[in-house]
Curated annotation (Swiss-Prot):
Belongs to the elongation factor P family. Its main location: cytoplasm. The lineage of its organism: Bacteria, Pseudomonadati, Bacteroidota, Flavobacteriia, Flavobacteriales. It is found in: Cytoplasm. This is Elongation factor P. Coiled coil: none annotated. It comes from the Bacteria. It comes from Flavobacterium johnsoniae (strain ATCC 17061 / DSM 2064 / JCM 8514 / BCRC 14874 / CCUG 350202 / NBRC 14942 / NCIMB 11054 / UW101). The keyword Cell membrane does not apply. One of its GO terms (molecular function) is translation elongation factor activity.
Length: 188
């Protein structure tokens, strides 16, 4: 058992008969009253995000996890297949456990957290950004550049992304996996 002073981002805990990953936390010590910790928890079984407040010194049940590098192989319905980069063992994960399944390209390396007690995958950390090719881009209308004008584009994985007007089919773009937004055009 750990206490609230051990809370950090990425920590996996057992709480309310479910397994959660701490996304954000803030230690608060008000002028009046006891200290507490505000947390944002993501359920690793359902993917729902929950706000919770722990009082200072509250005991939390930490789950031991190991992190391994896996390579994305292919999607099959709601299942996504990965291969361990070290042991070449293959696993399939439901798309609910992934943050941005529509941005996964074959060969992308991800970090998978595995519960050491049950050997079940808990969560998948995507790379911070991915580089994908634009397969379809709406034509940009000239004269609409007074403000930050954007248009819809489809990338090779099938995801839709808002991009600036100068992006055309065949361009490679860098996409932020956390927000799914356009970052920059990549020159080869």
């Amino acid at each position: 058992m750990a206490s609230t002073s051990d809370i950090r981002n990425g920590l996996c805990i057992k709480f309310n008969h479910d397994i959660y990953k701490i996304i954000e936390f803030l230690h608060v010590k008000p002028g009046k009253g006891p200290a507490f910790v505000r947390t944002k928890l993501k359920s690793l079984t359902s993917g729902k995000v929950l706000d919770n407040t722990f009082s200072a010194g509250h005991k939390i049940d930490v789950i031991r996890v190991e992190t391994h590098t896996f390579q994305f192989l292919y999607p099959e319905g709601d299942e996504f297949h990965f291969m361990n980069a070290e042991t070449f063992e293959q696993i399939s994960l439901n798309k609910n456990i992934l943050d941005a399944p529509d941005l996964l390209k074959e060969g992308t390396n991800v970090m998978v957290q595995i519960n050491t007690e049950t050997d079940l995958p808990l969560s998948v950390d995507m790379p911070a950004s991915v580089i994908l090719e634009v397969t379809y881009a709406e034509p940009g209308v000239k004269g609409n550049t007074a403000t930050n004008a954007t248009k819809n584009a489809t990338v090779e994985t099938g995801a839709n992304v808002n991009v600036p007007l100068f992006i055309n089919e065949g361009d490679k773009i860098k996409i932020d996996t956390a927000s799914g937004s356009y970052m920059e055009r990549v020159k080869e």
